[in-house]
Amino acid sequence: MQHLNELVEKAKLAIESIQDKSLTALDEIRVEYFGKKGHFTQLMQELRNVSAEERPAMGAKINEAKQAALEFLNAKKTEWEQAELNSKLEKERVDVSLPGRKVETGGLHPVTMTINRVTKFFSELGFSVENGPEIESDYYNFDALNIPKHHPARADHDTFWFNPELLLRTQTSGVQIRTMEKMQPPIRIMAPGRVYRNDYDQTHTPMFHQIELLYVDKKANFTELKGLLHDFLRAFFEEDLQVRFRPSYFPFTEPSAEVDVMGKNGKWLEVLGCGMVHPNVLRNVGIDPNEYSGFAVGMGVERLTMLRYNVTDLRSFFENDLRFLKQFK
């Protein structure tokens, strides 16, 4: 019995002497005392040498000592596991009062934002979006739009030609022709897209974006056009702008006008061009100009974006400078 008490105390002392409450070291002691070759296991095996009369009492005493040591070990194990968990939780604790981590998300390009803004406004008025090819034929880009052969827009210094009949479109007006060929009035469409002109400076780039509108119906008139553009410009810029229509010339509209808005500096700023669809254009697509009339509008997306966000250099839209683009998120 004395031997058993000493063994229990020895086991407890070994457990207490473990440094840093190591669970690995604790498991080594468990194996040493309670494993297949452990001290208590060996004592149980030695019972075979004890007489049958003494064996039950001796076995009970060994089990009692073993249970006392094992309970002490398990208690320490539970205590140390909880301490380890508490330490881990303390290190991983989150201060919910701290601001969240900033998530770097992408954003729409300012040109895309303008396209969405324009198309949303006109779609609510019944205009649908139509698209067309960017590599266009001479007919759809010039001839069908009443642009004569000698017009300077056809020159190499203005237009990117592949051959005498194919070019990169200089305007999305070809979409209007294609739409009028396949649809009968009333027609109410908008044509956003990329266009190309051989020019590059602070206010021009070889590729830019344009949105054109076409409305064809019986009794379409310039008064409707003016009212539509007044409403659009005030909605787009979110200001009660002063708007001016100046007489101008475009081969595909007659009469034609350029539209200006009054800037904050007291100067007029050109924003778009418009006019009544020329009768020759209607005839080219098989629409009787004596029965139907229409108006068309052309606007440069980058131009509108520059005015809305006070951008001074058109080239900034194409340089992918995050310092610039982040201002529009």
Curated annotation (Swiss-Prot):
Root EC class: ligase
Record family assignment: Belongs to the class-II aminoacyl-tRNA synthetase family. Phe-tRNA synthetase alpha subunit type 1 subfamily.
UniProt key word Methyltransferase: no
Manner of cofactor binding, per the entry note: Binds 2 magnesium ions per tetramer.
Residues that coordinate or bind Mg(2+): 254
CDD domains on file: PheRS_alpha_core
Any one GO BP annotation for this protein: phenylalanyl-tRNA aminoacylation
Cofactor(s) essential for the protein: Mg(2+)
Keywords of the record: Aminoacyl-tRNA synthetase, ATP-binding, Cytoplasm, Ligase, Magnesium, Metal-binding, Nucleotide-binding, Protein biosynthesis
Any one GO CC term of the record: cytoplasm
NCBIfam families assigned: pheS
Gene: pheS
Keyword set includes Ribonucleoprotein: no
Native source organism of the sequence: Haemophilus influenzae (strain ATCC 51907 / DSM 11121 / KW20 / Rd)
Listed EC numbers: 6.1.1.20
Assembly: Tetramer of two alpha and two beta subunits.
Name of the protein in question: Phenylalanine--tRNA ligase alpha subunit
SUPFAM superfamilies per the UniProt record, alphabetical: Class II aaRS and biotin synthetases, tRNA-binding arm
Catalytic activity: tRNA(Phe) + L-phenylalanine + ATP = L-phenylalanyl-tRNA(Phe) + AMP + diphosphate + H(+)
Location(s), subcellular: Cytoplasm
InterPro entries in UniProt: aa-tRNA-synth_II, aa-tRNA-synth_II/BPL/LPL, Phe-tRNA-synth_IIc_asu, Phe-tRNA_ligase_II_N, Phe_tRNA_ligase_alpha1_bac, Phenylalanyl-tRNA_Synthase, tRNA-bd_arm
